Amino acid sequence: MSSQTAQQLVLSDFAVDVRAGLTKPGQRELPSKYLYDEVGSELFEAICLLQEYGLTRADTRLLQRHANEIIARMPLPAHVAELGSGSGKKTRYLLEALACHRQTFYYPIEISPAALAACEKELGQLDCVSLVGYEKPYLEGLRAVAARREAQDHLCVLFLGSTIGNFDRPAADDFLRQVREVLEPGDSLLLGTDFEKDVNVQLLAYDDPVGVTAAFNLNLLARINRELGADFRLRDFRHLALWNSAERRIEMHLQSLRRQRVNIPGAALLVRMEEGETIWTESSHKYRPHEPVEMAARAGFRQIAQWVDEEWPFAQNLWIVE
């Protein structure tokens, strides 16, 4: 398949999802995966450096402090697959700890080509680590990785940060069950979960005063303009972060500041929006410390360890397949 043909297929999928989301009855929405084009991926890396966004620092601290302990608790894997690797900087701690024990194959699985390229640059030269990247949806990439290994080799799946929080709770359970279906006894999953905190602390993490998160969210409209020929006026929308206490999640929206009409030729769509109406772009569900154990059981795993950061309540949870 030529790169041009592949790009056309991506744009076609994008157009279909944009059309479906913006015509959805009740609440317009767009899939959060489309936030992460090249510009969005760079903006997200900037978000991770913000003082208000403590999640990435907590994630990294736990891996830095406990990498050897994490590796010691899991059946030693020959293969490591990471769902949504990003730049891969924090994963270095685990791979270096693992490389002390054996030659390892590392497979970053990303939908963002820019993030995948950054990861390959960051981790491609590690001693005793062979890197093979997959630009695929998570489950498709994981199935491809599982097909590569020998029968006796163990596989560890990394799902770090709080990406699981982007799924609503039933969808998270369903996704984790599908991950389990790919795995074999002796395989493991290291899952990051962000815990509930003071509401104002949580809101600041998703609506920083500098405006980086706002730019990240608004870039989705700019992407639709670039790739689908739309005429969204970014100044006519604002970034909105809300705490949904009933669902225990942060919601990111783009709110229309006036009554307006937007043409999206690439999706064969004309959108009419009222002042105050929103487009829901992302959710981040928060958890309580006991919940990962229950999630593991529902998905067919057993949790054998949990490491919690005290500065920013966040956990790495180690699950195994028995």
Describe the predicted segments one by one.
Residues 27-77:
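Class I SAM-dependent methyltransferase Rossmann-like catalytic core
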Residues 181-198:
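Conserved beta-strand signature within the Rossmann-like core of class I S-adenosyl-L-methionine
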Residues 112-114:
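Conserved SAM/SAH-binding beta-strand->alpha-helix loop
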Residues 166-178:
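A short, conserved alpha-helix within the catalytic core of class I
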Residues 87-101:
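Conserved SAM-binding loop of SAM-dependent methyltransferases across substrates and taxa
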Residues 1-34, 41:
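N-terminal auxiliary segments of SAM/dcSAM-dependent transferases
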Residues 77-86:
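Conserved class I S-adenosyl-L-methionine
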Residues 203-285, 289-299:
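Substrate-binding/catalytic lobe of Class I Rossmann-like enzymes that use SAM or dcSAM, i.e.
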